[in-house]
Swiss-Prot record:
Protein name per the record: Ectonucleoside triphosphate diphosphohydrolase 5
Keyword Metal-binding recorded: no
Gene label: Entpd5
GO cellular component, one term: endoplasmic reticulum
Catalyzed reactions per annotation: a ribonucleoside 5'-diphosphate + H2O = a ribonucleoside 5'-phosphate + phosphate + H(+); GDP + H2O = GMP + phosphate + H(+); UDP + H2O = UMP + phosphate + H(+); IDP + H2O = IMP + phosphate + H(+)
Organism of this sequence: Mus musculus (Mouse)
Length: 427
């Protein structure tokens, strides 16, 4: 039964609080959806979807379970199994078979999670993001072909185009849709939505629904996209900035992106402890890096280095200064690493909180003893990206989250529903 976008995404909301895979028993969206709506512990048709997220820093598998009570009725999202491996496929740029073996490892998770009787009708798809976008096309395709062979030799349903590199803007749209449906923002007649900020290793995305005509008029061509849902048309501002992910920004800050070679050269920064001499591998390339043995060190000189990476490089829609945004991925991780938020629960921060923590970490590099040596640089980059890149105000509130109602944030769930819609799959 192929369904419309509106029907498909109704699946996301209806039954997230009480699931097979998560223990929390709670009524979500009180007054809108009740826990009694969830078809748990009933005789129901069950079907599954497998979505691989091949990011720059790791490969993740999402196994979603859906139930359908009766034919002709919309199915419900019942739960998610999530696992991951590191490093990402791009680290195997010259060993594509080894890269594909990491996917095979995760595919065993799907076999363990899905009954054998459902294997041949469960679709499996891998979508690669910025890590593979940055590779030479021939090398990226070699990796994808090896993964495709793994899929073809699996017991699962392998649709056409099952292994591909996803467009960055599409990534942002699906993450926005997922978050806003899981938070119940798109279920009334109004359009009280939240924006989304995703910071990966190699790219970053910003997506929101503009409320002011001025934003639509002043936005560059290619930053706006429309889609229809619930008999409404949503015109989103969305853009993916390749090379502005957290780890790609480290290379840019160190000056390693412009370097013709890395052998024998140590890249230095005021964002690193003065005594530091270390190696770092990203995208299959090994870099030597260290602190400034002579010269300045701390937040101010670090900020000056990072500012060169972002200033004047990103579009700044004025509207974001007063908008509500959900932020995840490395925004969440670095906030949790520095105790700005609870690691499990997340929390709400102001943009200025990232700057405060960056100053605290960077101005104490002399006593740095544990954790990531890049912590000062990462926090400073996040601060500069939000303020000088996107143009957020110091007081702009950000909801930092890893999961919404026990489901991973990001684009994977939205992509799975789109996949099921295109294949016409129900129970």
């Amino acid at each position: 039964m192929a369904t419309s976008w509106g029907a498909v995404f109704m699946l996301i909301i209806a039954c997230v609080g009480s699931t097979v895979f998560y223990r929390e028993q709670q009524t979500w969206f009180e007054g809108v959806f009740l826990s009694s709506m969830c078809p748990i512990n009933v005789s129901a048709g069950t079907f599954y979807g497998i979505m691989f997220d091949a990011g720059s820093t790791g490969t993740r598998i999402h196994v979603y379970t859906f139930v359908q009570k009766t034919a002709g009725q919309l199915p419900f999202l019942e739960g998610e199994i999530f696992d991951s491996v590191k490093p990402g496929l791009s680290a195997f740029v010259d060993q594509p078979k080894q890269g594909a073996e990491t996917v095979q490892e995760l595919l065993e998770v799907a076999k363990d999670s899905i009954p054998r009787s459902h294997w041949e009708r469960t679709p499996v798809v891998l979508k690669a993001t910025a890590g593979l976008r940055l590779l030479p096309e021939q090398k990226a395709q070699a990796l994808l072909l090896e993964v495709e062979e793994i899929f073809k030799n699996s017991p699962f349903l392998v649709p056409d185009g099952s292994v591909s590199i996803m467009d960055g803007s599409y990534e942002g749209i699906l993450a926005w849709v997922t978050v806003n449906f899981l938070t119940g923002q798109l279920h009334g007649r109004g359009q009280e939505t939240v924006g989304t900020l995703d910071l990966g290793g190699a790219s970053t995305q910003i997506t929101f629904l503009p409320q002011f005509e001025k934003t639509l008029e002043q936005t560059p061509r290619g930053y706006l996209t429309s889609f229809e849902m619930f008999n409404s048309t949503f015109k989103l501002y969305t853009h993916s900035y390749l090379g502005f992910g957290l780890k790609a920004a480290r290379l840019a800050t160190l000056g390693a992106l412009e370097a013709k070679g890395t052998d024998g050269h140590t890249f230095r920064s005021a964002c690193l402890p003065r005594w530091l001499e270390a190696e770092w591998i990203f995208g299959g390339v090994k870099y030597q890096y260290g602190g400034n043995q002579e010269g300045e060190m701390g937040f101010e000189p670090c900020y000056a280095e990072v500012l060169r990476v972002v200033q004047g490089k990103l579009h700044q829609p004025e509207e974001v200064r007063g908008s509500a945004f959900y932020a995840f991925s490395y925004y969440y991780d670095r906030a949790a690493d520095t105790h700005l938020i609870d690691y499990e629960k997340g929390g709400v921060l102001k943009v200025e909180d990232f700057e405060r923590k960056a100053r605290e970490v960077c101005d104490n590099l002399g006593s740095f003893s544990s954790g990531s040596p890049f912590l000062c640089m990462d926090l400073t980059y996040i601060t500069a990206l939000l303020k000088d890149g996107f143009g957020f105000a110091d007081g702009t509130l950000l909801q930092l989250t890893k999961k919404v109602n026990n489901i991973e944030t990001g684009w994977a769930l939205g992509a799975t529903f789109h996949l099921l819609q295109s294949l016409g799959i129900t129970s």
